[in-house]
């Protein structure tokens, strides 16, 4: 997807969310990104609007890069939804469960393939995911 977001835009968003958390404006877990801004922007150059994105509880960057408006994302995070951000209209879904999004992404990919769709399915996970049986069953 073509984005006008810069690494600094992503960093600033996470810093703002961290500040809200430190000021007790968020009464739920948050998981912030740091250090991979250029890489994820590069990856999202290949993500199309019709593509699906699945990720874990650390999904703020993916949501922003998939087109979720900054203010809407911040509002949902402030409401305590940081680890379960789902925006079907933007085709982005996250799960608070390690490996929780992997089988769902796998099923979505199979459905898109069977429909003959041009949509791709992208699944972002952390390193602990590779230690779970569900990951290996789905990959």
Mark where each language-model region is:
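Cofactor-binding active-site loop characterized by glycine-rich and histidine/acidic residues
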Residues: 18, 24-139
């Amino acid at each position: 997807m073509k984005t006008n977001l810069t690494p600094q835009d992503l960093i600033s968003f996470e810093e703002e969310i961290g500040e809200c958390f430190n000021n007790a404006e968020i009464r739920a877990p948050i998981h912030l990104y740091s250090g991979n801004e250029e890489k994820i922007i590069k990856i999202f150059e290949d993500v199309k609007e019709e593509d699906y994105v699945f990720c874990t509880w650390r999904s703020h960057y993916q949501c922003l890069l998939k087109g979720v408006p900054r203010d809407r994302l911040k509002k949902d995070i402030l409401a305590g939804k940081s680890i379960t951000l789902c925006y079907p209209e933007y085709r982005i879904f996250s799960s608070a469960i390690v490996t929780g999004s992997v089988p769902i992404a796998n099923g979505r990919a199979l459905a898109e393939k069977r429909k003959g769709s041009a949509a791709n399915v992208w699944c972002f996970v952390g390193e602990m995911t590779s230690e779970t049986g569900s990951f290996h069953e789905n990959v």
